Each structure stands twice: as structure tokens, then as C-alpha cells.
């Protein structure tokens, strides 16, 4: 997920990375990263990804597509509305994630070894959960429903596209 500092990504099955966005967001290597994020041939898999997508769109200059939100898909296959990622992983993979660093100070640098491990553990199951949900959607005949929900989210994000910092400052 994306948040206030150490950002973590599952790049491909079996490969994960931690990117310290505040340290590298304006560097040349990040330009290639944003190209990958916006590559239409690569499906981006997120959990409760609205804020992540907003930040990606802000930094990349456009909304990354296509994307798959595991929280939306989980609701469509019967896991309940707004299922937490840890609960979904436990139900789908039978693994209890350590959430001790959920409310850690992600803005403090350097990130601790424990924070880095937490961040990497947080995406380890993202692609297997995605595959499980894709299969369940297909078996239940709900793949199109999910695609429609993702399209609605995309339209919603496009309609409210603005600098996240500006949006934060407008909260009263």
C-alpha cells in the first residue's frame, strides 16, 4: 500500500520491493517506475486502493490502468464489504499476518528492519489472493461485475483528480 513514507509493492509473483518515495520520487529511476505503473499491459493489484491510485495518478500524471482492487472483488464473492487485507489473507491463504506495525511512524527515517519486513510481508500474499478472487469471480459469473466496479472507481477518481496535498488542505 501507499502511505506516508515507505511504500511497498509486489512487482511480480515472487518479487517484492520497498521504495522510499520521499527519497527518490523526483529522480530519473522513478520515471521508469511510473512508466511501469501506467503500462496498460500490466494489471495493477491493490487492496482498498483508492488512495494509492490517487497518489499514483498525481505522481505519474495519469491514472494507472488496468487495476484490480482485492477489497472490491472480495465483497463480490462473499467475503463481506470492506474486508481488511489481513482478514482476507487469513481467509484465503490461511495465514495470520503480523499487523504490529500498522500504526508505526512511517515518516521516520531510516525505516527499521521490522518496518521493512512488515512492508514486504504485507504484499507477499497480494497476487495469490488476486488469483483466488479472479477465479471465484469467474466461477460465480461475476467477473464483469468486478470490471464494472473498477471502471466506476476509475471514473470517480478521474472526476476528482487533483493534487492530494491540496485535497488534504481542504479538509475542515
Where are these regions (language model features)?
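A short, charged helix-loop
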Residues: 87-114
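Short, compositionally biased low-complexity segments
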Residues: 60-62, 99, 159-164
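Conserved RNase H-like, two-metal-ion catalytic cores of nucleic-acid enzymes
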Residues: 1-87
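Mixed-charge, glycine-rich, non-catalytic linkers/tails in nucleic-acid processing enzymes
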Residues: 113-172
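Short, surface-exposed recognition loops or helix-turn segments adjacent to catalytic cores
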Residues: 68-73, 100-108, 138-149
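Residue-level signal for pocket-adjacent positions within structured domains
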Residues: 14-16, 63, 92, 101, ...
